[in-house]
Amino acid sequence: MDPAWDGSQGSRPGTASIRVRELSWQGLNNPQPQNKRLGSHGDIYRERRVEEHLSPARLQALAQVDDLQLVRVLEMCVDTRKNSLGNFGMHLPNLIQLKLNHSCLGSLRDLGTSLGQLQVLWLARCGLTDLDGIGSFLALKELYVSYNNISDLSPLCLLEQLEVLDLEGNNVEDLGQMRYLQLCPRLTTLTLEGNLVCLKPDPGPSNKAPQDYNYRAEVKKLIPQLHILDEVPTTCTNLPAPQKLSQDWLMVKEAIKEGNVLDILLPRLECSHGATIRKFDPTLPVPETQPWALSLLVPEGPLPEGLLSENPAAEDHASNLTHGPGQVLCGNPTKGLRERRNQYQEWAPLEQLPPHRPDLAIRPSTLRPDPAESCDLSMTGLRAWREPGLRPLLQRQLEFQQERLTHVQAQDPQKAPIEQEDQTGPKTSLTPLRLASELSRTSGFHLIPSPPKYPMPPESGISSLGRSADLPFRGRRLRVLGSLGPSLGEGSVLGERLALRALEVSSDPSHRAQGCPDPKPSLGPATCPLGLHCLHHLNPIPPAHPFP
């Protein structure tokens, strides 16, 4: 800015690079946001995301006191990788005991340098690899750092007031590290169990201790002021020492170091006097639960055997949609799952499908019936058409086929019958018998036909021959029945053709399977209902001769 320029001279020259514009509005230009008072635990959790350190308000909420000078004991679980503790010790001038078990600490320097009056410190299972920064706690008398990864004890030489030291389950391998503890004149209690120094004096490839090595006697020589070693008086130096560190013990040691989840989920057996236990950054992982048994989810009773795999232990780690680990799904997964579903519906046993009509008598069977059961299927189709509940569905199918045929004929009246015969084939006849059998096949169940009024002998190998021989006789009876009664009118001929058609299909199913053309063209859908009314007048035909 030009220092010689005065505002009274007019506007600033065009060389100015900064312009200031005042806002003409009432009130403060930069109002401060209103602070929200800490209330419930939900507010504490929400504001914890904003605050980057332990503020006095948060310490008051943790200790449940208004005056932080009254706090002497504080226990919390922190994670310095996510939240910084700051210099919280300056707000707790009278803090004597601090318990941070199961926390995640990168270093002791994360605790700050304002805890000079602290006397007892718990840091069990905190993931510590060293003790750098312990010199800030000059008044420390008891230090519990069990089950960490500490191997260097040199920072402890600055603690002249130290009396109790717990190093259980650490990585102290060199007996020479005990020399640093000589500089702690008041050290009386030491715990070294679980360190490699208890087996051998020096680190090496072998995990076997020398025959004449006694770590209790060696530690007593290096730390003469020590009174208790591993909860046993140091005067007892003849205790048998373990000669080999087994792999099971190492596994248990590592499990204890990483067993914070178990301690968090289990209830506390004891609580120190003072501040209530609070967790600054609780991360409670939900334990993995085993899936409930299928029998517990179905209150009706046990499940069918078809729903359960033969070997459930071999497929408990794989989803049913991924075909297990033995097969690889390539290409479009949606298309593959759709094809798999269609294939499963075609080949799966019907025990796995739910009942479609509970009011009808049904029996499960395979989706591909044997040729020997074709007669039962034909009679079942006729009975299914006579069921009142199934008529609307068949009627809709007939209307759909009629609309489709009308649309094709409107486009090309000459080629429509030929194209439909080529596309659908002989299996897509528009007779109600074929539609009824198709309905029973798509629904997955076959209706149980009504029992015959006359006893029939069991089917044998010559059953198909008997049906073929009996076909002319039944045809004559049907023609006679179709000609009786003036009420039938023109529908008698159609009823005769439909009945004969059903008998031909039931007697010789291989005739249509071989692709032979029908002797007569298929009837149109518009004339099908008239023929079906004629079938209501059919009565059971008594056998001409008694069976042997």
UniProtKB/Swiss-Prot annotation:
InterPro entries: Leu-rich_rpt, Leu-rich_rpt_4, LRR_dom_sf, LRRC56
GO BP terms in the entry: cell projection organization
Keyword Nucleus set for record: no
Family: Belongs to the LRRC56 family.
Organism (species): Rattus norvegicus
Keyword field: Cell projection, Cilium, Cilium biogenesis/degradation, Leucine-rich repeat, Repeat
Subcellular location(s) per record: Cell projection, Cilium
Gene3D superfamilies the record matches: Ribonuclease Inhibitor
GO cellular component, one term: cilium
Region (Disordered): 405-433
Residue intervals of the LRRCT domain: 207-249
LRR repeats: 94-115, 117-138, 139-160, 161-182, 186-206
Protein task: Required for the assembly of dynein arms.
Gene that specifies this protein: Lrrc56
Subunit structure: Interacts with IFT88.
Domain of life: Eukaryota
Protein name stated in the entry: Leucine-rich repeat-containing protein 56
Keyword Repeat: yes
